[in-house]
Amino acid sequence: MGREFIPLFEDWAATYDQTVQGLDIQYKEAFRGYDHILDAIVRKSGTHVLEFGPGTGNLTAKLLDAGKTVFGIEPSPAMRKLASDKLSGRTEIVDGDFLTFPEPPFQADTIVSSYAFHHLTDEEKRAAIKQYGKYLHLHDKIVFADTVFENAQAYQQAIDKARSQGFYQLANDLETEHYPTLDALKEMFTAEGFAVRFTQQNDFVWIMEAIKR
């Protein structure tokens, strides 16, 4: 359920905001347009939002600034602490993950996440989408931004390119985490009654908007 990556985020928490600002050259392209990507998620979201993997609270803050009600689910204690400090009590960030989490204190009309869904295996992704499909009402939506590849060949090319650039940490991440392809995600969402569309944001990240039919 992605919890095997908690030690990574415990270590990364203190420097995560510097990374998303493009200060780590290996991840600069993945976070190119970061603020624009988060703003796009906010625009596509409804009024009551369930957020998975808020990390240090960057998307959460933008959602709250837009007047939305937010309930955050974050498995990393270090990330929860940073998010709580950043948000100054404006909303609650609780322990949980994409599959196991406390029930929100409201009925969410949108489920969002940024840079996190790839921590689930394909089987777990499918189970999560199924769970959300049962929870959401007609016309509610899922809006995720994450690294996705057009196909398996593009995935391998990204790994090879990272290695050729000397970006060995990035290459290792690409090889050990569970990055999906567009076709795989489309099949998962469609199987659970969602109409989904994908919009590319940079060489790595796509926004997926899935509307419950």
UniProtKB/Swiss-Prot annotation:
Q: Which domain of life is it from?
A: Bacteria
Q: What is a single Pfam family found in this protein's UniProt entry?
A: Methyltransf_25
Enzyme class at the top of the EC tree: transferase
Q: Does the keyword S-adenosyl-L-methionine apply?
A: yes
Would the keyword Transferase turn up in this protein's UniProt record? yes
Q: What is its EC number?
A: 2.1.1.-
Instruction: Tell me which GO cellular component terms the UniProt record holds.
Output: cytosol
Q: Which cysteines are joined by disulfide bonds?
A: none
The entry's keywords: Methyltransferase, S-adenosyl-L-methionine, Transferase
Which InterPro entries did the record assign?
Methyltransf_25, rRNA_Ade_methylase_Trfase_N, SAM-dependent_MTases_sf, Uncharacterised_MeTfrase_YrrT
GO terms classed as biological process: rRNA methylation
Residues binding S-adenosyl-L-methionine, per UniProt:
G53, E74, D97
Q: Which GO terms describe its molecular function?
A: rRNA (adenine-N6,N6-)-dimethyltransferase activity
Conditions for induction: By methionine. Repressed by sulfate and cysteine.
Task of the protein: Could be a S-adenosyl-L-methionine-dependent methyltransferase.
Family (UniProt): Belongs to the methyltransferase superfamily. YrrT family.
> What PANTHER family does its record include?
TRANS-ACONITATE 2-METHYLTRANSFERASE-RELATED (PTHR43861)
Please state what the protein is called: Uncharacterized methyltransferase YrrT
